[in-house]
Curated annotation (Swiss-Prot):
One Pfam family from the record: MoaC
UniProt keyword rRNA-binding present: no
EC numbers, comma separated: 4.6.1.17
Family: Belongs to the MoaC family.
Subunit structure: Homohexamer; trimer of dimers.
GO biological process, one term: Mo-molybdopterin cofactor biosynthetic process
Binding site for substrate: L75, C76, H77, M113, E114
Name of encoding gene: moaC
GO molecular function: cyclic pyranopterin monophosphate synthase activity
Record-given protein name: Cyclic pyranopterin monophosphate synthase
Record-annotated membrane-spanning stretches: none
Keywords: Lyase, Molybdenum cofactor biosynthesis
Reactions mediated catalytically: (8S)-3',8-cyclo-7,8-dihydroguanosine 5'-triphosphate = cyclic pyranopterin phosphate + diphosphate
Length: 158
């Protein structure tokens, strides 16, 4: 099993030194889902939520989440992101909203945390905007789907 990189020899947390790593194109894709009542889904689909355009605001929140990851996750490096693409899919069969985020940079460390944070913040925004009508919404299945670039190469979830 690989070693955990965020701990020194004494077991103390530290920020990993990426200064000696080569700069490469880094891409990560993450996704997640928020399940809800059918009536809540319809409010979102029709654009009738009292707080406004749920998907539009959640998209901006997800982008902001990716950009602010280093402020939220203590040992993440602040990164100059070159792209954050956020897609929402409305799924009336569940009913749910699926969020998929692709984050890119050209740098020395990956962007998996930025993609995961973006998905979570986007879905949390959906919850915030709809909680008055559905406190039982559930955020689920948040995970990295793929990553590309860096020393460890490409990885795609099964």
């Amino acid at each position: 099993m690989p070693e955990l990189t965020h701990f020194d020899a004494a077991g103390q947390a530290h920020m990993v030194d990426v200064g000696g790593k080569a700069e490469t194109k880094r891409i990560a894709v993450a996704r997640g889902t928020i399940r809800m009542l059918p009536a809540t889904f319809e409010l979102i689909r029709k654009g009738e939520a009292k707080k406004g355009d749920v998907i539009g605001i959640a998209r901006i929140a997800a982008i902001q989440g990716a950009k602010r990851t280093a402020d939220l996750i203590p040992l993440c490096h602040p990164l100059a992101l070159t792209r954050v693409a956020v897609d929402f899919e409305l799924d009336e069969t569940v009913p749910a909203v699926h969020c998929r985020v692709q984050v890119e940079t050209h740098g020395r460390t990956g962007v998996e945390m930025e993609a995961l944070t973006a998905v979570q913040v986007g879905l949390l925004t959906v919850y915030d905007m709809c909680k008055a009508v559905d406190r039982g919404m559930t955020i689920t299945d948040v995970k990295v789907m793929e990553k590309h670039g860096g020393k460890s190469g490409d990885w795609v979830a099964e």
